[in-house]
Amino acid sequence: MTVILYSRPGCHLCEDARAMLVRAGAAFEERDIEADDVLFRRYLERIPVIVIDGEETFELVVDEAALRARLGTFAGS
């Protein structure tokens, strides 16, 4: 499973999404949209965006239970 978190510095929702991925034990790559003009234009108003296996699965506010279900992980695992 490939998981990518699109974020930017100073984004509190991005920090929350990152923490959820860590708590879920997910291996993920984080990409700073400010480092790429194309990503910046695409995701500026939508971050955080979590892409799982090529599908934009979550954006803006991430529900932790839904994220864990999509990743196949559960609280306490």
Briefly describe each language-model feature range.
Residues 1-24:
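Local sequence-structure signature of Cys/Sec-based thiol-disulfide redox active-site neighborhoods
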Residues 8, 13, 39-42, 48, ...:
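Accessory recognition modules or surfaces
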